[in-house]
């Protein structure tokens, strides 16, 4: 085969990119798991670069591990979001060396203290960096497009 993409260097570069994309998918899955584990601030913050930013675009951003932990800890203590389920789909991930970008569709459901079920529809725009050899969030931005109560009577 004469195409460059099939020579050893081309194959190794393509394999590296596929491995990077898979590592980023797993990073996002770990983020969702941390959120769904009663908003475990330690677990979520550990997924970010030390000065990484978590930002729900409806509120002020949280910069750095301490701010991210505090934000998620406040959600946990308040009990305002229980039994959450973050479902992300349709990822578009572009890797460029030790940095990458990603866009994900989001569907989240949760229950509030009055046992009402809520649904959030939106998307994430993320930037990632390879930090000490491991993919981490540089910036995670959540954009909410719809926020609605599914069952106001708790049924």
Task: State where each predicted segment sits.
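A beta-strand edge to alpha-helix "cap/lid" segment located at domain peripheries
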Residues: 2-12, 77-155
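A short, hydrophobic secondary-structure junction motif
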Residues: 24, 52-54, 125-131
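Short, well-structured alpha-helical interface segments that form or flank functional binding sites
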Residues: 26, 63, 123
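Generic recognition of cysteine residues
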Residues: 32-35, 62, 149
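A solvent-exposed, acidic/Ser-Thr-rich amphipathic alpha-helical stretch
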Residues: 40-106
């Amino acid at each position: 085969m004469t195409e460059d993409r099939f020579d050893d260097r081309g194959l190794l570069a393509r394999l590296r990119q596929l491995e990077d994309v898979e590592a980023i998918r797993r990073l996002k899955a770990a983020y969702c798991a941390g959120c769904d584990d009663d908003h475990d601030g330690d677990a979520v913050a550990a997924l970010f670069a030390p000065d990484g930013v978590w930002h729900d675009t409806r509120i002020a951003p949280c910069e750095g591990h301490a701010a991210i932990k505090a934000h998620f800890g406040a959600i946990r203590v308040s009990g305002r979001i229980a039994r959450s389920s973050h479902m992300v789909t349709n990822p578009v991930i572009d890797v460029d060396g030790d940095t990458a970008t990603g866009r994900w569709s989001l569907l989240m459901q949760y229950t509030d203290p009055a046992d009402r079920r809520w649904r959030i529809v939106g998307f994430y725009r993320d930037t990632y960096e390879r930090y000490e050899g491991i993919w981490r969030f540089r910036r995670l931005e959540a954009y909410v497009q719809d926020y609605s109560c599914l069952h106001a009577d708790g049924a």
